[in-house]
Amino acid sequence: MSDSPRRFPTPLLLTGVMGVLILIALLTFTLMRSWDNAPDQSALLGKPAPNFSLPLLHDPSLQISNTDLAGAPYLLHVWGSWCAACATEQPVLTHFALSKRVRVIGYNWKDRREDALQWLEQLGNPYLAVVSDPEGKTAMDWGVTAAPTTFLIDGRGIVRWHHKGALNQQIIEHKLLPILADIEHSPTAAPALHQAP
């Protein structure tokens, strides 16, 4: 039996394989960019925010509801002490809250109270108030499936903006602030209520 000589891939075959790999890389890059730039969709956009009445994290004997927040816009920010992305965005959220453009309400989701309080003590508390939903039942009405998730609700109680994922300065400047400005300049908008110092 004679051994046939070993055949090496032809330059044409190598070029074809490289072309396919480049095409796959370009498609992946394009899909990732379109995913990053896709608008945040929520079935709640343009609709009344779901009713809620939840205990305050710092004093569970007190409750806060969406009717308590009516009359002025507020940002409802869903977070958990177990959420790495929440810790990453905390400095950005704190900086935004200091601007006092809108009330920032924390929504502690699927968390133990002790862990959440310790997390706020370590990383800072940018919130006017923090509600607690340890079982995550009320969050289901909002369509929350992950933290962090952020909603902007106008003074009439309508959900105007939704973002799933960590906030950064670019998202705040290019997505959140234009909608907030629209709310502030709307003839039917309630006057903005700023956070307490």
Curated annotation (Swiss-Prot):
It comes from the Bacteria. Residues 43-181 form the Thioredoxin domain. GO terms for cellular component: outer membrane-bounded periplasmic space; plasma membrane. Keywords: Cell inner membrane, Cell membrane, Cytochrome c-type biogenesis, Disulfide bond, Membrane, Redox-active center, Transmembrane, Transmembrane helix. Gene3D superfamilies: Glutaredoxin (3.40.30.10). One of its GO terms (biological process) is cytochrome complex assembly. PANTHER family: THIOL:DISULFIDE INTERCHANGE PROTEIN DSBE. This is Thiol:disulfide interchange protein DsbE. It comes from Xylella fastidiosa (strain 9a5c). The gene is dsbE.
